[in-house]
Regions:
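Predominantly flavin-linked oxidoreductase catalytic cores and closely associated redox partners
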Residues: 1-114
Length: 115
């Protein structure tokens, strides 16, 4: 298939097969320091007073992601008995079956510190 246009915009996403082909064919990463992007998922939970620790911040790296996927989690205690729980997953992951939302569910279900 041939495209003929003054400008062509490709907007298929960071993992698109066409994008990867174009980057490789035209060496689009040469002399660049490309940014990386991630998707963040967050929930706010109300917890019992005895499990809430005002101002406490916890960060984690890796788990539950595999060794080839970067990211990590966070837990912020704030407000009155509120905890913000989140997971960030780098969008350069290679596993096409990785589901950031499912990984977030694994992350939040493993937080025994809140139970």
């Amino acid at each position: 298939m041939a495209f003929h246009a003054r400008i062509t915009i490709f907007a298929e996403g960071a993992h698109g097969s066409l994008t990867k082909t174009l980057v490789k064919k035209y060496n689009l990463r040469k002399k660049s320091d490309p940014q990386t992007y991630g998707i963040g998922l967050k929930e706010v939970w109300e917890v019992p007073k005895e499990q809430w620790r005002e101002g406490e911040i916890t960060h984690s790296m890796g788990y539950p992601l595999d060794k080839d996927t970067y990211g990590g989690g966070f837990m912020y205690h704030f407000g009155e008995n509120l905890v913000s729980l989140g997971l960030v997953v780098g969008l350069d992951y290679r596993n096409p079956y990785l589901n950031p939302y499912q990984e977030f569910q694994v992350h939040t279900s493993s937080l025994t510190i809140l139970y």
